[in-house]
């Protein structure tokens, strides 16, 4: 590290190479005498920005070598602040950007990285508290007195006082209402944020998240200033946090200076209630991310070079505008400055579209959306489908009349510069496969969950805790519980065997009013990445993806649908039978391959859709007809039904004893107290933690005994139908048994699938087949109803009828043409069983397929 006693001329030349950012109003900060004299003596281009709010000076090291952003040795503590530039809140930048080992470092062409989420760096005029005029030089005797007398123009923020208050908050605040599960690994009797700084020193992640609720409880005036003037106050917080950190850990090395990120602002606004009074204030809104753009490079500092004399200068961006130098300050040539892109400094930027959460929407309204801009480290932190609480600064920018003309309209468009994301939803399960959402469990919580898993009746207790307001349907609840746990995801693509899905698909079908939609709503409100849609109100592109023109870039972009948004979650589809054919056809690939192939408008890609499908369907005749098969009742293609692991019937039994028990249960929901309800069922928070822990940390594998049991189960299922000449099981049924067995092992927190898991999977699968794949004429389970759409007995009857019809035609002699109606009546007359017109048509088509006859209009012609 260079010595602070280097010659002033070298220091001035180093600093003078860049030009200062323009002020919004054209004013400059009043300098203290020591710095003003240094500025007057300077012969370099530009001016030295004063630092009235902090003893640290904005003075760069004169060394030609770059420096690491670390604290100096303890013996040189006096030089610490002048060398490191812990960032002025008025000319805000990160000192580490000119150092080695940090992004975009090395060449002077990559200067100080500012925080784009707070807006660009700018000079801020300070005024005397007791005067309308700017502070005069003769009134200022020292930097300390300046900090005590002045506030930032347009605000009531005194930087020295603000910094002192925040340092006191960080060093002293202890949250009396803190919960251990929310502060894992922290001592709740010690200052919370000092422990957070210690974490930064250990981990090296230079971000300090501040709960605004803590700040409000500690100092309401400081909290008010933060909400009203975030662009001025947050840099002051940054400076205070860095001073505390490097005084405590002088040898620490960070990527860049610590950035304070406040969240949980009390000024939490509904997206609809944002109005002009919130502009440039700190707000918190919640919603669901529906689209994220690609990473956009945004210029932070422009590098200009004179084409005549090769003089260079830098211009910092102010609110998205570049003040291009019109005259070269060295040779006074006009319009000779050219922008050098590879010497300019850029930052990462991403546009995120946030949609209003369904629970925040008023009745009968369409959801509102707003645009977010994430910068640098906040890029790619959220994905479409995430539910987030966003803390940021509400901005308004004018709209240009024409992109090529600088004239602007009087109408402004708004966006939010993101400062903090918080992906938490207390009502839902904790997410999986996402580092930011993985639930951290305390040792006590894990011990309690493992103790719960050791109980022999844990499977029944968890199933009873699922939708306790819905009466009975125990097997259906157990099936949905296994769907929530899911199987083990296996990838054998390196051996050429491909990937095997772990998601369980379930279809509920039956009479109206049997709580099918209630179960779907319960699951939707429980899972983190769930989507709820209705079959009648969904289109094929709404479920998959569609191409639209980006309003910002005017380019064609892919907008994802419900199935892609519910990746790693559950997609609940109600009114499944009312979906049109084109919409249902897109589900075939999703439910088996777990991917979605798109080829639209020149965009060809394959999206992940690793989602479980929970669907509900009503019968065509509004009431289940026991004389018809499942296919005939709900009119769904057998190719789609065969992809469901479990198909349950929810029928109204029309039994007086059942009706009495159901009525007693419904009435009890109204008169029982909450304490009684809690005693009967498992706590909802425990259920969510239990499922989240199992999905994250338990990955069961098949044992030798379980493998043999699965083989025997599959072979026995095949044997059932072999004697009658029909197929009663397919490989898909075996894969379903494996997934259900793995899910049941997860319920027990077991990393090995045992025989008891296979037995329960067999029982549940058999119960579902008894309901959905039973031939109504014979009462025998026939899996071919779901796989081919026709039972074996129906197929046999069709063949027999075709043979009878063939004999009837042969008995009529060599007649080339027969009347359709006459032939039908003759067949009905000689048959003992009732023959419908549909059966007659099927027999004719069977003979036509054998090239025996052809049907033309109302005439049957022999071939």
Swiss-Prot record:
Protein name: DNA replication licensing factor mcm4-B
Motif residue range(s): Arginine finger: 642-645
Biological role stated in the UniProt entry: Acts as a component of the MCM2-7 complex (MCM complex) which is the replicative helicase essential for 'once per cell cycle' DNA replication initiation and elongation in eukaryotic cells. Core component of CDC45-MCM-GINS (CMG) helicase, the molecular machine that unwinds template DNA during replication, and around which the replisome is built.
Gene name for this UniProt entry: mcm4-b
Biased composition (Polar residues): 54-64, 84-99
Positions of region (Disordered): 1-130
Enzyme class: hydrolase
Matching Pfam families: MCM, MCM4_WHD, MCM_lid, MCM_N, MCM_OB
């Amino acid at each position: 590290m260079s010595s602070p006693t280097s010659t002033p001329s070298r220091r001035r030349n180093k600093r003078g190479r860049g030009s200062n950012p323009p002020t919004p109003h054209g004013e400059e900060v009043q300098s203290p005498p020591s710095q003003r004299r240094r500025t007057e003596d300077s012969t370099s281009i530009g001016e030295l920005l004063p630092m009235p709010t902090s003893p640290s000076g904005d003075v760069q090291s004169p060394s030609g070598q770059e420096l690491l952003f670390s604290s100096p040795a303890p013996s040189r503590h006096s030089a610490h602040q002048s060398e490191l530039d812990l960032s002025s809140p008025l000319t805000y930048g990160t000192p580490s950007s000119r150092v080695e080992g940090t992004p975009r470092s090395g060449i002077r062409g990559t200067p100080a990285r500012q925080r784009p989420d707070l807006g660009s760096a700018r000079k801020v005029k300070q005024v005397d508290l007791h005067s309308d005029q700017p502070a005069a030089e003769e009134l200022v005797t020292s930097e300390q007195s300046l900090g005590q007398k002045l506030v930032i123009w347009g605000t009531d923020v005194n930087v020295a006082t603000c910094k002192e208050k925040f340092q006191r908050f960080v060093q002293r605040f202890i949250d009396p209402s803190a919960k251990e599960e929310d502060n894992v690994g922290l001592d709740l009797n010690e200052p919370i944020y000092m422990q957070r700084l210690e974490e930064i020193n250990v981990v090296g992640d230079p971000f300090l998240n501040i709960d605004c609720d803590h700040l409000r409880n500690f100092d309401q005036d400081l909290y008010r200033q933060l909400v009203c003037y975030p662009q001025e106050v947050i840099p002051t917080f940054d400076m205070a946090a860095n001073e505390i950190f490097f005084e405590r850990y002088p040898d620490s090395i960070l990527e860049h200076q610590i950035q304070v990120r406040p969240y949980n602002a009390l000024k939490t606004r509904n997206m609809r209630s944002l109005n002009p009074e919130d502009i440039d204030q700190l707000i918190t809104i919640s919603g669901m991310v529906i689209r994220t753009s690609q990473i956009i490079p945004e210029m932070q500092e422009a590098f200009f070079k004179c084409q005549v004399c090769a003089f260079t200068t830098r211009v910092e961006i102010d609110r998205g505008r570049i003040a291009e130098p019109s005259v070269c300050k060295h040779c006074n040539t006009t319009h000779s400055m050219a922008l050098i892109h590879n010497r300019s400094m850029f930052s990462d930027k991403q546009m995120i579209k946030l949609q209003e959460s369904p629970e925040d929407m008023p009745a009968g309204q369409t959801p509102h959306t707003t645009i977010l801009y994430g910068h640098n480290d906040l890029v790619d932190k959220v994905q479409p489908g995430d539910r987030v609480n966003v803390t940021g600064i509400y901005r308004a920018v004018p709209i240009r009349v024409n992109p090529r003309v600088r004239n602007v309209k009087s109408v402004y468009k708004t966006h939010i510069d993101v400062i903090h994301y918080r992906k938490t939803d207390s009502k839902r399960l904790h997410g999986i496969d996402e580092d930011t959402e993985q639930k951290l469990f305390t040792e006590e919580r894990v011990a309690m969950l493992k103790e719960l898993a050791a109980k022999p009746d844990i499977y029944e207790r968890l199933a009873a805790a699922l939708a306790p307001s819905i009466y009975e349907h125990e097997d259906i609840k157990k099936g949905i519980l296994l769907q929530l746990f899911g199987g083990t995801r296996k990838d054998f693509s390196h051996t050429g065997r491909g990937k095997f899905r772990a998601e369980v698909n379930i279809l509920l079908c039956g009479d109206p009013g049997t709580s099918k939609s209630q179960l779907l709503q319960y699951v939707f409100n429980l899972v983190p990445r769930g989507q709820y849609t209705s079959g009648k109100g969904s289109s094929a592109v709404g479920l998959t993806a569609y191409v639209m023109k980006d309003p910002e870039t005017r380019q064609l972009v892919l907008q994802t649908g419900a199935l892609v948004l519910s990746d790693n979650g559950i997609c609940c589809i109600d009114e499944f039978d009312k979906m049109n054919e084109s919409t249902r056809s897109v589900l075939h690939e999703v439910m088996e391959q777990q991917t979605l192939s798109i080829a639209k408008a020149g965009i060809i890609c394959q999206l992940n859709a690793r989602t479980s499908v929970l669907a509900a369907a009503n019968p065509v005749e509004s009431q289940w007809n026991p004389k018809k098969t499942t296919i005939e009742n709900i009119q769904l293609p057998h190719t789609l039904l065969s992809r469901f692991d479990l198909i349950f019937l929810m029928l109204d039994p029309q039994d007086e004893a059942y009706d009495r028990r159901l009525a007693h249960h419904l009435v009890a929901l109204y008169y029982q107290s909450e304490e009684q309800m809690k005693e009967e069922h498992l706590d909802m928070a425990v259920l969510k933690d239990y499922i989240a822990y199992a999905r994250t940390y338990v990955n069961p594998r098949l044992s030798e005994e379980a493998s043999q049991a699965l083989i025997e189960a599959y072979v026995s299922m095949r044997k059932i139908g072999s004697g009658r000449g029909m197929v009663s099981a397919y490989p898909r049924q075996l894969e379903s048994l494996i997934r259900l067995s793995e899910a049941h092992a997860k319920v027990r927190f077991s990393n090995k699938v045992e025989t008891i898991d296979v037995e329960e999977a067999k029982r549940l699968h058999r119960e579902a087949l008894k309901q959905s794949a039973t031939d109504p004429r014979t009462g025998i389970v026939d899996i071919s109803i779901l796989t081919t759409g026709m039972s074996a007995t129906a197929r046999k009857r069709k063949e027999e009828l075709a043979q009878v019809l063939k004999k009837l035609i042969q008995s009529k002699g060599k007649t080339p043409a027969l009347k359709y109606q006459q032939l039908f009546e003759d067949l009905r007359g000689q048959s003992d069983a009732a023959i419908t017109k549909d059966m007659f048509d099927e027999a004719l088509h069977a003979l036509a397929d054998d090239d025996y006859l052809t049907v033309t209009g109302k005439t049957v012609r022999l071939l």
